[in-house]
From Swiss-Prot:
Gene Ontology MF term list: DNA binding
Name by which UniProt lists this protein: Uncharacterized response regulatory protein YgeK
DNA-binding region: 165-184
InterPro entries: CheY-like_superfamily, Sig_transdc_resp-reg_C-effctor, Sig_transdc_resp-reg_receiver, Tscrpt_reg_LuxR_C, WalR-like
GO BP term (any one): phosphorelay signal transduction system
Source species of the chain: Escherichia coli O157:H7
Domain Response regulatory residue range list: 5-122
SMART domains xref list: HTH_LUXR
Keyword tags: DNA-binding, Transcription, Transcription regulation
């Protein structure tokens, strides 16, 4: 597998430089093909370079959150969007998902979370920063015929944290097949058919906050 191509865009040049500098510590993993204050130029670079990841920052006096993601997606880019934003009340995680974002990382978070977001999304998963889930609260939302077990609740938390089946298996000391079975059971109980729907449902239930 080759390097992951990344484009960065933010209204603040020092933020762009900071992200590029951080990702530069991993030359074998990432190739930053451009960093732009001008959003239209960033989108053009995504299309020109066939970037896999677009780290989308904030822009004053205009669109924000899901509205901004929709506008970027309207330009038909193939890159997966990670929003890189300040932790603010206007950020609605469900709307970000529905708009087409694959992840969100807070600017106040540890830089390692940006690594996790990029790696998770590149492997077909979503990643939303600071997802905290209350396993007891999850279980209390269900009647006895479809209640999640404690193990299923634990796995749902790890899925929402952006962990892959393999990572969950290693963390819980289970086989990958067992984790896959639990995941299918969770999706059946919640009546969802994709990873994105799974996270959306958890958010709507109020069992996690982003």
């Amino acid at each position: 597998m080759g390097k992951i191509k990344i484009v960065v865009s933010d209204q603040q040049p020092f933020m762009i430089d900071g992200i590029i500098g951080f990702l530069g510590h991993y030359p074998d993993l990432y190739e930053v093909v451009g960093g732009y204050k001008d959003l239209k130029k960033a989108i053009a670079e995504c299309n020109k370079s066939a970037a896999q990841i677009f780290i989308l920052g904030e822009f004053a006096g205009g669109m924000m959150g899901a509205e901004l993601v929709k506008w970027v997606k309207s330009h038909k880019i193939d890159a997966h969007i990670i929003t890189f934003v300040a932790k603010m009340p206007y950020i609605d995680s469900i709307k970000l998902l529905e708009a087409g974002a694959k992840g969100c990382v807070w600017k106040t978070s540890h830089p390692a979370k940006l690594n996790r977001a990029i790696d998770s999304i590149s492997n077909g998963y979503t990643y939303f920063d600071s997802v905290h889930m209350d396993c007891e609260k999850i279980s209390s939302r269900y009647s006895s015929d479809n209640q999640l077990t404690n193990r299923e609740s634990e796995i749902l938390q790890l899925i929402a944290d952006g962990k892959t089946n393999k990572e969950i298996a290693n963390f819980l000391q289970l086989s990958r097949k067992t984790v896959e079975t639990h995941r299918l059971n969770i999706m059946k109980k919640l009546d969802v058919h994709s990873g994105i729907e799974l996270i959306k449902t958890a958010l709507r239930m109020g069992v996690c906050t982003i």
